[in-house]
Curated annotation (Swiss-Prot):
Chief location: membrane
Gene coding for it: atpA
Highest taxon of the lineage: Bacteria
Role played: Produces ATP from ADP in the presence of a proton gradient across the membrane. The alpha chain is a regulatory subunit.
Name of the protein this chain belongs to: ATP synthase subunit alpha
PANTHER family: ATP SYNTHASE SUBUNIT ALPHA, MITOCHONDRIAL (PTHR48082:SF2)
Subcellular location: Cell inner membrane
Subunit structure: F-type ATPases have 2 components, CF(1) - the catalytic core - and CF(0) - the membrane proton channel. CF(1) has five subunits: alpha(3), beta(3), gamma(1), delta(1), epsilon(1). CF(0) has three main subunits: a(1), b(2) and c(9-12). The alpha and beta chains form an alternating ring which encloses part of the gamma chain. CF(1) is attached to CF(0) by a central stalk formed by the gamma and epsilon chains, while a peripheral stalk is formed by the delta and b chains.
Length: 509
């Protein structure tokens, strides 16, 4: 073998010329103890609160407790591979997630990493997870409707764009069903391709079973709703820090649409589980417990999240972010700590009851306890025209329902009231996955409050409604179009509608 001195020296010269003197500088600390998703780290003197840190093997964590001699870090992942003495690096960045339209149709984890096997995400940019809510000046009062396609909600508890409306009830009362229907209902605006009316949806699943999340994704895909939806999943098997951060991550993704003049809807399903995850983290970090062992700042945990939902003024692009948080109660106890907190933060609540659900009244909305504090300003005039009287009649019916058992002894006026109430209650029932267009809801409720159902057997109300709507679509679509475009029932439209209903009632059998 021949040794060429000239060649060797040329290679050595080249190596020396390209030798980089710049060493990689990182501030590091050492793990003192680890367990239950929490690591105590010594060092990291300059770490910021909420900063991302990196453990060996690429596992990320977030610095939450900054104490005199150590830092309490919550671990976003499996802590079994982290051991005492491991080196922890500062990343210099606060926790952030990808945002943009590239996320639509995807399922991501709490840190924005795709978990649906469809390849990497093309994000517009990355934004911080925990940012301040918009101030008072850039906001505008809620004035545009956010249609859910559910008669009971759109008529009695209307929701506007930029509103925060709580959905509260025991387990298995149909909370998620209402929310999934709301997402599916937005398809009609996406199909119409009206950019101003489109509503992008974000569904944040916190602490739910993986099978449940998979089922929801499948349902949304089947109905073509995944095209405008992002699903953020932090399931029950994920560590508490990921369940805690997921709602904020989803909210940041929604804020991208709000701040770019678009409209978004975010669903947190559910915040009780986020509060439980936060309680677990806080207790393990040895923060002092308060009522029901929740930490003292659990109110702030939810208020800073829900205050980020807003309707922006014209100067700020006129976008909006509507929030529908979910709270699960135990035995219909609305006066527990977390439910009362969230009720006081939101602009109203939809209260679902087990008893109604088992009676077959679905959606099981308790109309008496449910309110919408700002939604009436967003309701279209046509719905206001018919919904005013249905509220009153249902309230009177609930008051009188206690006497319904002694129906034979009641005067005709009360009997009539009870009969009307029973039919209106039947009219507000709606099967799952069949949201209605606003103009159809208006016609359906109009028929109820104007007495067209009074002579019909209660069991036939559903059939009457479906026949009426299919008949009106085929024979008098101009009535539907008039209500949809004018957003009110004008005198001419009402005349046509009355004539149509009179004729239809005679033929219905």
């Amino acid at each position: 073998m021949e040794i060429r001195a000239a060649e060797i020296s040329a290679i050595l010269k080249q190596q020396i010329a390209t030798f980089g003197t710049e060493a990689e500088v990182a501030e590091v600390g050492q793990v003192l103890s680890v367990g239950d998703g929490i690591a105590r780290v010594h060092g990291l003197d300059k770490v910021q609160a909420g900063e991302m840190v990196e453990f060996p093997g690429g596992i990320k964590g977030m610095a939450l407790n900054l104490e005199t001699d150590n830092v309490g870090v919550v671990i976003f992942g499996d802590d079994r591979n982290i051991k005492e003495g491991d080196v922890v690096k500062r990343t210099g960045s606060i926790v952030d997630v990808p945002v943009g339209k590239g996320l639509l149709g995807r399922v991501v984890d709490a840190l924005g990493n795709p978990i649906d096997g469809k390849g990497p995400i093309e994000a517009a940019s990355r934004q911080r997870v925990d940012v301040k809510a918009p101030g008072i000046i850039p906001r505008k009062s809620v004035h545009e409707p956010m249609s859910t396609g559910i008669k009971a909600v759109d008529a009695l508890i209307p929701i506007g764009r930029g509103q925060r409306e709580l959905v509260i009830g025991d387990r298995q009362t149909g909370k998620t069903a209402i929310l999934v229907d709301t997402i599916i209902n937005q398809k009609r605006w996406h199909d119409a391709n009206d950019e101003k009316a489109k509503l992008f949806c974000i569904y944040v699943a916190v602490g739910q079973k993986r099978s449940t999340v998979a089922q929801i994704v499948k349902t949304l895909t089947d109905y073509g709703a995944m095209d405008y939806t992002i699903v953020v999943a932090a399931t029950a098997s994920e560590p508490a820090p990921l369940q805690f951060i997921a709602p904020y991550a989803g909210c940041t993704m929604g804020e991208y649409f709000r701040d770019n003049g678009m409209h978004a809807l975010i669903i947190y399903d559910d915040l009780s589980k986020q509060a439980v995850a936060y309680r677990q983290m806080s207790l393990l970090l040895r923060r002092p417990p308060g009522r029901e062992a929740y930490p003292g700042d659990v109110f702030y945990l939810h208020s800073r999240l829900l205050e980020r939902a807003a309707k922006m003024g014209d100067a700020a692009g006129a976008g909006s972010l509507t929030a529908l948080p979910v709270i699960e109660t135990q035995a219909n106890d609305v006066s527990a700590y977390i439910p009362t907190n969230v009720i006081s933060i939101t602009d109203g609540q939809i209260f679902l009851e087990t008893e109604l659900f088992y009676k077959g009244i679905r959606p099981a909305v308790n109309v008496g306890l449910s309110v919408s504090r700002v939604g009436s300003a967003a309701q279209i005039k046509a719905m206001k025209q018919v919904a005013g009287s249905i509220k009153l009649e249902l309230a009177q019916y609930r008051e009188m329902a206690a006497f319904a058992q002694f129906a034979s002894d009641l005067d005709p006026a009360t009997q009539k009231l009870l009969a009307r109430g029973a039919r209106l209650t039947e009219l507000l029932k709606q099967p799952q996955f069949s949201p209605m267009a606003t103009e159809e809801e208006v016609i359906s409720i109009y028929a109820g409050v104007k007495g067209y159902l009074d002579k019909i057997d209660v069991r036939q109300v559903g059939r009457f409604e479906s026949s009426l709507l299919s008949e009106i679509k085929s024979k008098a679509p101009e009535i539907l179009t008039a209500i949809a475009t004018e957003k009110q029932i004008s005198a001419q439209t009402e005349e046509k509608l009355k004539a149509f209903l009179d004729a239809f009632s005679k033929t219905f059998a």
